[in-house]
Amino acid sequence: MIKLIATDIDGTLVADGTLDLNPEYYDVIKELKRRGTIVLAASGRQRASIEKVFTPVLDDISFISENGTCIHSKDYQYVDVIDPEIVRTYIEEARQFPGCEIAINKDNMTYMAVSYTHLTLPTN
């Protein structure tokens, strides 16, 4: 019996950066769960983006998001948190490089310096 099937999302199940999953996969995921097989989708994406891809089967699938730092399923969530002092050190070091842009991801959120207005979406 197959106990676990793990797959990448971007470039494997969907075209890079899209939400276009073949609807037939939803039935496959449900059938695998019925048979007792865990389906695990992994991505560097944030959780909200992955949830949009798998909305019809969120109760039937587990996923790894944020480049491996978060694991989610219907009944479980694990988030690996980096010590804030280490983050501060990395930010200070990165600021030494001209043109280096810093984005810090937290489960379902990205923090960017206010000076990076060229990277933000318009508000109107």
Where are these regions (language model features)?
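Active-site phosphate-binding/coordination module
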Residues: 20, 24-116
